[in-house]
Amino acid sequence: MQGSVIEFLKPHLVNIEQISSTHAKVTLEPLERGFGHTLGNALRRILLSSMPGCAVAEVEIDGVLHEYSSKEGVQEDILEVLLNLKGLAVKVSGKNDVTLTLNKSGIGPVLAADITHDGDVEIINPNHVICHLTDKDASINMRIYVQRGRGYVPASARVHSQDEDRPIGRLLVDARFSPVDRIAYNVEAARVEQRTDLDKLIIDMETNGTIDPEEAIRRAATILAEQLDAFVDLRDVRQPEIKEEKPEFDPILLRPVDDLELTVRSANCLKAETIHYIGDLVQRTEVELLKTPNLGKKSLTEIKDVLASRGLSLGMRLENWPPASIAED
């Protein structure tokens, strides 16, 4: 009897009511009191903000330099055209970004079905209206750049990350990557045998058609479970101590002596003695350097002062010098 008091009930999927191909209601019960709101709110937030999908991110329209303009023969202004393009439901297989083209002329509506694309792309809502052409000689030509992402990313958040040489006329669009259009949940009372203090979770959601509602909930639950994995066993959360690999030699020792900016006379004397790197130089003693032809006390003093300004001195001993990278050269 004690076990039944402390053990949690394990919920199960009771019903999936498929209202349409993009609209479904999912019922989950029984849940311990309070868990309906706990799980419902978590799943709702993930479904709205963290689901991956594809969306229109940029658009180029022939004859249009900026979004605050209009195009002759097009009923809508450019801002409205961009707003309509945001409603395009695109499904892309195997790629992170694709370019679609749209070329239409003559009087009538311009639909998503008029977009040209390859076999990796599927337009879910082909009857979606993009704009209307009002003249028989009117035409519209555009390149639509679709990217894969997550959640909602406004155009303003991507401006700083774009190249400065962005072509004039390439318009940024607020990208709504999430395939979930609407999500709501309701918690009702549930009963199991004599217990009446239980919850029933009902999730009501609509998608843009690029993902099945049931699959969307399954993915959201997977994301939530993966995020909670770190808490499953707190004894294992300690990270192994990572020992930083210190370089065998101070990087300054691997630099050429030319970096010391010595006088031409001193530099030539060192090169004549095959002293090419600072690591070669610091291992020489004052006596050894004074034996170098044409290198006098003035040059020696200059070398000592330059080394001292870098925290080095003559007569140093370096184990395993030269390193393999220099020896190979």
Curated annotation (Swiss-Prot):
Keyword Transferase among record annotations: yes
BP term (GO), one: DNA-templated transcription
Pfam (any one): RNA_pol_A_CTD
One GO CC term, this protein: DNA-directed RNA polymerase complex
InterPro entries xref list: DNA-dir_RNA_pol_insert (IPR011262), DNA-dir_RNA_pol_RpoA/D/Rpb3 (IPR011263), DNA-dir_RpoA (IPR011773), RBP11-like (IPR036603), RNAP_asu_C (IPR011260), RNApol_insert_sf (IPR036643)
Signal peptide range: none
Entry EC number(s): 2.7.7.6
GO molecular function annotations of the record: DNA binding; DNA-directed RNA polymerase activity; protein dimerization activity
Gene3D superfamilies linked: 5' to 3' exonuclease, C-terminal subdomain (1.10.150.20), DNA-directed RNA polymerase, insert domain (2.170.120.12), RNA polymerase, RBP11-like subunit (3.30.1360.10)
Region of interest (Alpha N-terminal domain (alpha-NTD)), ranges: 1-235
Chain positions covered by the region annotation Alpha C-terminal domain (alpha-CTD): 249-329
Keywords: DNA-directed RNA polymerase, Nucleotidyltransferase, Transcription, Transferase
NCBIfam families per UniProt: PRK05182.1-2, PRK05182.2-5, rpoA
Function: DNA-dependent RNA polymerase catalyzes the transcription of DNA into RNA using the four ribonucleoside triphosphates as substrates.
Family note: Belongs to the RNA polymerase alpha chain family.
Self-association and partners: Homodimer. The RNAP catalytic core consists of 2 alpha, 1 beta, 1 beta' and 1 omega subunit. When a sigma factor is associated with the core the holoenzyme is formed, which can initiate transcription.
Notes on the domains: The N-terminal domain is essential for RNAP assembly and basal transcription, whereas the C-terminal domain is involved in interaction with transcriptional regulators and with upstream promoter elements.
Protein name per its UniProtKB record: DNA-directed RNA polymerase subunit alpha
Gene name as annotated: rpoA
